[in-house]
């Protein structure tokens, strides 16, 4: 239950969106010695635990008995997560700025591909964190844990539970650190500021990884590079999937305004596309209006001004207006508070005094700046 400028928010948690206050956690978990744990926070007794948590070079001295007490401290977080499994294998990496990354996954005998896939998670995290921090703001904690869980993917402070080592899910859940764990937006009222912004950010991280890691791995393999480039030419680009999902929703009759409480949508379909896809398109279209470079500056300023402060949609727009110098209330009101759509058509085309002229007509009810590209007979644009 959270109290803010609107009063108390006693919204029940129904395994969907949540809204909570930051606090400091101290947690002690006593469990059979055979279990390996991972989760939120910093382990306070690593040299009594071992399992890869010990200080490099230190001798592990576990207490007598068949149980261990794991002692965690987690400052300035709004939830605490932990997982335990006797079959976890623990990979540890340290980034250039001193953040410790933990990967805990279920070891499978005689399955080296499983080991390689989870090792790739650790290596990819080290690779992309500098890009993430430069683009979205510094990671403020000392550790992050990628933990093999039982279902899907779910984000928590300092860690995530993952059903598998797919990097798309890994990046998405990690980016929830920037778009929820650090912002603390009321997800019940603004799920699109959580899931939509995370979708948009993780697509950028995936593109960075693809261009800077995947492609480099293929150097010297001309056939593989050609195959990757040919696939890239026909596969969706960045936000294309989200645009298609939004278009389908807009035509379906199930769309509701994004101001709808996340638990009160008439359909899960309407909620899902609004929160994820239309939220992602919101961020991409903002870049179309103000320019991608300015949009990126907006995100860094948003992080600077509003981390650990529970921003709402108006707070975001005010930052965008400050950075861009453009009035943007209209954009928020049309896109978020209505289901009006953007659609323009060519109304007429004529020649006047040797000059070709084109008149556009707005068909949809939502206004939007429009760029037009003309292609001439010789192929020039």
Language-model regions, residue ranges each:
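Hydrophobic alpha-helical and helix-loop surface patches within well-folded domains
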Residues: 72, 103-363
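Solvent-exposed loop and beta-edge segments used for protein-protein assembly and interaction
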Residues: 19-21, 64-66, 277, 352, ...
């Amino acid at each position: 239950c959270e109290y803010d400028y609107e009063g108390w928010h006693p919204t029940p948690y129904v395994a969907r969106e949540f809204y909570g206050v930051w606090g400091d956690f101290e947690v002690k978990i006593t469990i059979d010695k055979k279990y390996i744990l991972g989760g939120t926070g910093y382990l306070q007794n690593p040299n009594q635990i071992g399992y890869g948590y010990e200080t490099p070079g230190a001798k592990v001295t576990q207490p007598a008995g068949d149980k261990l007490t794991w002692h965690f401290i987690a400052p300035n977080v709004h939830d605490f997560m932990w997982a335990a499994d006797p079959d976890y294998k623990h990979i540890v990496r340290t980034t250039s700025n001193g953040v410790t990354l933990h990967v805990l996954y279920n070891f499978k005998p005689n399955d080296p591909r499983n080991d390689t896939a989870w090792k790739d998670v650790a290596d990819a995290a080290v690779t992309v964190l500098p890009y993430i921090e430069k683009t979205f703001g510094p990671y403020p904690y000392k550790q992050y844990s990628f933990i093999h869980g039982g279902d899907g993917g779910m984000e928590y402070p300092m860690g995530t539970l993952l059903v598998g080592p797919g990097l798309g899910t890994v990046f998405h859940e990690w980016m929830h650190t920037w778009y929820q764990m650090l912002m603390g937006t009321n997800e019940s009222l603004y799920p699109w500021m959580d899931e939509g912004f995370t979708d948009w950010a993780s697509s950028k991280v995936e593109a960075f990884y693809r261009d800077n890691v995947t492609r480099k791995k293929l150097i010297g393999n001309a056939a593989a590079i050609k195959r990757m480039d040919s696939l890239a030419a026909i596969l969706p680009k960045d936000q294309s999937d989200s645009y298609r999902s939004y278009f389908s929703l807009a035509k379906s009759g199930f769309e509701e305004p994004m101001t709808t409480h996340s638990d009160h949508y008439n359909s899960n379909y309407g909620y899902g596309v609004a929160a994820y896809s239309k939220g992602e398109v919101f961020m991409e279209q903002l870049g179309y209006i103000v320019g991608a470079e300015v949009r990126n500056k907006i995100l860094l300023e948003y992080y600077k001004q509003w981390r650990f402060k529970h921003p709402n949609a108006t707070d975001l727009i005010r930052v965008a207006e400050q950075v861009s110098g453009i009035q943007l209330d209209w954009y928020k009101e049309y896109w978020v508070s209505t289901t009006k759509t953007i659609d323009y058509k060519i109304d007429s085309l004529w020649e006047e005094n040797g000059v070709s002229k084109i008149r556009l007509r707005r068909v949809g009810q939502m206004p939007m700046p429009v760029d037009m590209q003309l292609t001439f007979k010789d192929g020039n644009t």
